[in-house]
Amino acid sequence: MSSGKVVQVIGPVVDVQFPLSESLPDIDDALKVKREDGTELVIEVALELGDGIMRTVAMDSTDGLKRGAEVEGTGASISVPVGKDTLGRVFNVLGNTIDNGPEFDEDHPRNPIHRDAPKYDQLSTGIEILETGIKVIDLLAPYIKGGKIGLFGGAGVGKTVLIQELIHNIAQEHNGISVFTGVGERTREGNDLYFEMKESGVLEKTAMVFGQMNEPPGARMRVALTGLTLAEYFRDVEGQDVLLFIDNIFRFTQAGSEVSALLGRIPSAVGYQPTLATEMGQLQERITSTKKGSVTSIQAVYVPADDYTDPAPATTFAHLDATTNLERSLTQQGIYPAVDPLASTSSALTPEIVGEEHYEVATEVQHVLQRYRELQDIISILGMDELSDEEKIIVARARRIQFFLSQNFHVAEQFTGNPGSYVPVEETVKGFKEILEGKYDNLPEEAFRLVGGIEDVVEKAKKLAGNN
């Protein structure tokens, strides 16, 4: 293995000089360097500067590094443990366990985090819907097995809670395996998620990988690849359908932009790295269905200042099959999950994939909600009395639909005190069809808020009538 010396440290970026007589390490190779206190730091080769100098990115803090420190090549890229033993465990970017449990042996199967996307002849072309049990998603923006789904929303609108609910529903109802990757988010949230999942029994079906806010950009930039490598093993070797959760894909881009300038690259639009589209493509192209199994990815996308034209969310958009847009105005009305029924989209919402009835009900729901949105200006200026009888019916049904799109979550039970609900797709379609037909026009609007199926609405209406 080639060995060199540290010649410069600029924050998370370390320059290493190798003797010209030796072969240089490859791009993306992992190198090891000892700090003054004897601890080991892993750095990854990013660029060759010439004269035997390689510019690298550190996977941990560079505190305690000094010029002249010995650097050893490993001859390979970072590799992480894979297999069934990873379920129920928590890892960092390097594949080291961080849950106080036993470490994995050196001879445990490991895969490199840098890999090529599956070849075209390995890809599966069939389309299958993934039922989530969340009404607004299953009805208006259904998820595809092996697809890529974006959860868009600003700060504090409920992206992480929605992800937790999806993990819960997939584990409990579908017995599915999930890999949760925390990229640059709050450590407290990761900690809470771990203990909540342990309590609810979901953890045995989930592997967790974290590179949180307090970690250097190198770790945040590579941790998504670590999570993806774990998921790929279950797809390619075990032949399973895996859910890969990434919270938050924006932080992956943000970490790349933090190191980009230090690596000497000229920034592009809004200060992002010029390699933004390439980095995103290398990650996203590996997330797909093959003939052996599938990786379905659900990615929370933080939208800076709620600006969807920002290059980071805009680049992510290009790769997605479905989008779930969370809207702050809905949280203010107490509608949870705060999914915007008109802005959320899915390429699977076609009669050929979801069926004729589902498609017709979904488009009619969107039509009624769109008409209600148009009428709101008239209502706010002139009041309800100025509407025609037909428009009054549309408004009444739209409000019932809007409330019926909300539901209680299992993972929020401890905060709300209300039990969560899982609603099968057939029941969801049936409920909305009956509301559109006017079957429940006589029930109070409040009966539709935060309930499961349509039977729950009737029950709640009886309770409300009893209380009055």
Curated annotation (Swiss-Prot):
Gene3D superfamilies: 2.40.10.170, Bovine Mitochondrial F1-atpase, Atp Synthase Beta Chain, Chain D, domain 3, P-loop containing nucleotide triphosphate hydrolases. F-type ATPases have 2 components, CF(1) - the catalytic core - and CF(0) - the membrane proton channel. CF(1) has five subunits: alpha(3), beta(3), gamma(1), delta(1), epsilon(1). CF(0) has three main subunits: a(1), b(2) and c(9-12). The alpha and beta chains form an alternating ring which encloses part of the gamma chain. CF(1) is attached to CF(0) by a central stalk formed by the gamma and epsilon chains, while a peripheral stalk is formed by the delta and b chains. It comes from the Bacteria. It is found in: Cell membrane. Its EC number is 7.1.2.2. PANTHER family: ATP SYNTHASE (PTHR15184), ATP SYNTHASE SUBUNIT BETA, MITOCHONDRIAL (PTHR15184:SF71). Its main location: membrane. It catalyses: ATP + H2O + 4 H(+)(in) = ADP + phosphate + 5 H(+)(out). SUPFAM superfamilies: C-terminal domain of alpha and beta subunits of F1 ATP synthase, N-terminal domain of alpha and beta subunits of F1 ATP synthase, P-loop containing nucleoside triphosphate hydrolases. PROSITE patterns: ATPASE_ALPHA_BETA. Belongs to the ATPase alpha/beta chains family. Keywords: ATP synthesis, ATP-binding, Cell membrane, CF(1), Hydrogen ion transport, Ion transport, Membrane, Nucleotide-binding, Translocase, Transport. Disulfide bonds: none annotated. Produces ATP from ADP in the presence of a proton gradient across the membrane. The catalytic sites are hosted primarily by the beta subunits. This is ATP synthase subunit beta. It is a peripheral membrane protein. It is an enzyme of class 7 (translocase). One of its GO terms (cellular component) is plasma membrane. ATP binds at G153, G154, A155, G156, V157, G158, K159, T160. GO terms for molecular function: ATP binding; ATP hydrolysis activity; proton-transporting ATP synthase activity, rotational mechanism.
